[in-house]
């Protein structure tokens, strides 16, 4: 084998010659190989060992230029357009030959590609350096098939070139700042270097685990721009003021004790801390406070005053007359029976256990009506009697048989409820006329809207507009097109109108042909009715529609209840006087459901006759109570006015035993600002004596308006101003006033 030196240049020569043999026009951009500067071939006679002079010199400037151009070609090959042309120049030539040499066809195709990308706004940093429209601008404008002054082509070319240049500038700007950012980074620490080395070794071993990037710690340094957020306002520096306290303090009146806080404030827990209403917690969510340990309190000093106060007090006033040793059961029973008799004599007493009076129908057998199924089902008209003059008054409340006249006082049964139903309802009826009107037929099943009685009807307020008659003057020229033109008004019914006209709006509820008379008939004995109305009075029942709401403000009610005939004050008086008619005959009966009987027929005296409480008729109402005489109660109708300043001066003059002139002189000295020796209380004085002396020293009007609370409030003000000491007496009946220390 020969030396390897001569064989290497031969191989390189052959490869280079083969590379040069391919024309540039036949190669595509993706397959194009750019020739690199090769070292000069060594002579064949030189031995295999190379000599330093045979190697080319290192050109740094040329290498920098090649690196810059390599980026351009990389961007060129990475573009999306497959037919995008790249510069065919070689990097081995000098700088003057960097402009690519394209044919006219390639220039035209390159121009159309640039205009298309510019129109679609797809020029980015990736393909901006591969578009050579700026380099071939002059050749494009000077082509033979176009005119030299084609401004449309020039404008489009200039617009696309501007966009390409702008994107190139942005790309260079971004690269520069990226390089500057890399220069500003600190040197990696030893831990990061070890981490990179470990990651590199892991990658070499075939692992695909990515290195965990360390989290960057962002240091936020915020400087407040608004100075008002740093400064505290004057309102926040002040103590929080309670609005309830402001309102209470503003309404404080020196002339009365209503504004004293001690009488209005409350305590919340055992600490007896006075709290304003705004500070009181209605529902406390915290744990309740534990009570402190109760210690012993020394009460030896209070023993004597408490014993003195307890001597004059009664332990139980209700048992003050009770004696343990001298108590007698007979005397006690007599007092109790006298008290019970006193209550029994009252007219308003009601005894639910009272015995019912015997019925006038003596021939009727005993027993309840519900158990007698064999009784006659037809109405019995013989029980009414021959007194026809009472028939017109008794028929509305008359029952069909004597057994039904006595209605039991059962709770919630039909026999208790039916007598309350009146077919001629009035203002004292149990049910309202409007509710009873629902049984008048299908037309009245719906409740009617309530009519306004006071307000005048709307039909009266609206004036009737006179409609002008339509006349046609045959002698006048009338434009019939105006009357027969097509208007904008709809000629068909709308959808909403058709929906409203449904069967509910045009059809009455189903009529079940319910007979109202069955409501007052018994189920097992239809012939017996609980209520029956005379045929002559059936027409009069229609007057309920005219009944208006009861006016409770009428003069009869507002002036001492309802005036009328007074009931007898005593149970022994005759009740027949209440039923005497205008002619002297008995026109009404205390028994509205029974025929009247004389005292001789009944066997009882007139005093024994009374109202039957078990008969509930419409006219048998409760008698009105005894009318109370109108008694005028005298009370203070005007507010008391008191000059507190003058009252304090008078009280202070009495405490210091000064005359009137001396008190006025002291007041003048105080107003002038002169310093004078403060007067002191001469001797101990009592509040009761001060009040009596004030009534004599004050003017008549002020003396009349003076009261104990006002005098005590004035004394409290003086005690605060003059340093007085107030002490209570042992029996707490008076206040002792003396000069403080």
From Swiss-Prot:
Changing residue 243 to L: In MCPH23; impairs mitotic chromosome compaction. Widely expressed at low level. Expressed in proliferating cells. InterPro entries: Condensin_barren_su2. GO terms for molecular function: chromatin binding. One of its GO terms (biological process) is meiotic chromosome condensation. Residues 1-67, 361-383, 447-467 are annotated as: Disordered. It is linked to Microcephaly 23, primary, autosomal recessive: A form of microcephaly, a disease defined as a head circumference more than 3 standard deviations below the age, sex and ethnically matched mean. Brain weight is markedly reduced and the cerebral cortex is disproportionately small. Belongs to the CND2 (condensin subunit 2) family. Regulatory subunit of the condensin complex, a complex required for conversion of interphase chromatin into mitotic-like condense chromosomes. The condensin complex probably introduces positive supercoils into relaxed DNA in the presence of type I topoisomerases and converts nicked DNA into positive knotted forms in the presence of type II topoisomerases. Early in neurogenesis, may play an essential role to ensure accurate mitotic chromosome condensation in neuron stem cells, ultimately affecting neuron pool and cortex size. This is Condensin complex subunit 2.
